[in-house]
Swiss-Prot record:
The gene is doxH. SUPFAM superfamilies: OMPA-like (SSF56925). Pathway: Aromatic compound metabolism; naphthalene degradation. Pfam families: OmpW. GO terms for cellular component: outer membrane. Keywords: Aromatic hydrocarbons catabolism, Plasmid. It comes from Pseudomonas sp. (strain C18). It comes from the Bacteria. Encoded on an unnamed 75 kb plasmid. Gene3D superfamilies: 2.40.160.20. InterPro entries: OMP/PagP_b-brl (IPR011250), OMPW (IPR005618). May be involved in the conversion of 2-hydroxy-4-(2'-oxo-3,5-cyclohexadienyl)-buta-2,4-dienoate to cis-O-hydroxybenzylidenepyruvate. DoxH and doxJ encode different enzymes that may have interchangeable functions. GO terms for biological process: catabolic process; transmembrane transport. This is Dibenzothiophene metabolism operon protein DoxH. The keyword Signal does not apply.
Length: 211
């Protein structure tokens, strides 16, 4: 009776309770994510395809936050967001060394995951879902009036949580995004457009807590 009263008056005490931690469907993770692009592009100048022209994007690291909700023992929903990093977009193929511009972006990935059988303290999972990448800023380099579009894409997810002690765990996750976007600008007097394939691989390591 006393414990119940304390929980009603001080909800934070309930969060610290082992019984509550075991029953809560909510998880939270904070960690670092590496974004490794597998980039290519179809480049057009004044509407004409540039033979062999392509593009590349620099890899990034970002602080990320991951929120999870357990639907039941087998299924959960996860969403990851982060501090927006900036990638440098450069020419490739027959356009080597051309600094096209910089893009500050933020992918938000939502996946439905299935929990595989646990291996001791290791709890693996697989899943799939959707990503929305928002472009916060496009900065000029050799391309003037450089601009890139927001984009949606499918996402795949595989990972594992490794229990440390009651309620705390280490989380390792890999997410693959099949992401394309359109970019445009001016290279001198010529109008430049590109259909850019980014297809990043997001590799995360984080500390997690069940609340």
């Amino acid at each position: 009776m006393i414990k119940r009263t304390i929980c009603l008056v001080y909800p934070l005490f309930c969060l610290a309770s082992p019984t509550w931690a075991e029953e809560s469907p909510w998880t939270y993770r904070i960690g670092m994510t590496n974004v490794a692009f597998d980039a290519s592009a179809k480049v057009y100048l004044n509407g004409q395809r540039v033979p062999g022209g392509s593009a590349d994007a620099s890899d990034n690291n970002a602080l990320t936050f991951d929120f999870g909700y357990a639907i039941n023992d087998q299924w959960n929903v996860r969403a990851i967001v982060g501090i927006p990093p900036t990638t440098k977009v450069t020419g490739a193929g027959t356009l080597p060394g051309i600094q096209l511009g910089k893009i500050t972006y933020a992918p938000t990935v939502l996946t439905l995951n299935y929990n595989l059988p646990a291996l001791g303290p290791v709890r693996p999972h697989i899943g799939a879902g959707v990503n929305y990448t928002r472009i916060f800023e496009s900065r000029d380099a050799n391309l003037k009036s450089f601009d890139a579009d927001h984009a949606w894409s499918p996402a795949l997810h595989v990972g594992a949580d490794i229990d440390v002690n009651r309620g705390w765990f280490v989380s390792i996750d890999i997410r693959k995004l099949y992401l394309k976007t359109d970019a445009s600008g001016y290279l001198g007097p010529q109008e430049a457009k590109a259909r850019v394939t980014l297809d990043p691989l997001l590799t995360s390591i984080a500390i997690g807590r069940q609340f």
